[in-house]
Amino acid sequence: MTSAVRDRAPAAPVADERTERRPVLLLSFDILFDEQAIDDAIGFALEAGVELLVCLANTLPTANANAAARRHMGNPVVREQMLEIVRLARDAGAEAQQLVYNSPRPISALFGVVRDRRIGLVVFGPNRRSYGRLRFRWHLRRIRRNADCLVWPLEA
């Protein structure tokens, strides 16, 4: 092998098109959001230059047919916190929206939201004290196993 071939750097592949940027989803199940999760979600959205969706999933009762027909917008305290998160994200320079959905199975419905909205990162952010340590781990594991995107936090 000649020195001319050995000293030449290999040609680096060049991407023809940019990678698609997909939004960040901050999720809670009708429980106040964790402060660290809020900061992480806003930071991830700013760093990637993508939209932040602040999502509240409400569980509908299935035992009573009349109750299942009633949709609600969630706990008013949590709704106020969602407005504050959206305001914080916009003040920091990120685009932000609220998303509320009702389902008898909110975790299963989440996978449809992730697919339909083409979410790139789910930040699972309910307050762990209110939500419960074991339930948090179980739901995080299920979301991580079935979601078509990245899921944060990495550890429960």
Question: For the regions a protein language model found, what residue spans apply to each?
Answer:
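Structural beta-alpha unit
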Residues: 1-19, 91-122, 141
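Structural motif
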Residues: 27-31, 125-129, 156
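A short acidic, glycine-rich active-site loop
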Residues: 71-80
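Glycine-rich, Arg-bearing micro-motifs that act as flexible, cationic patches
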Residues: 124-145
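Short, flexible loop segments at boundaries between secondary-structure elements
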Residues: 144-156
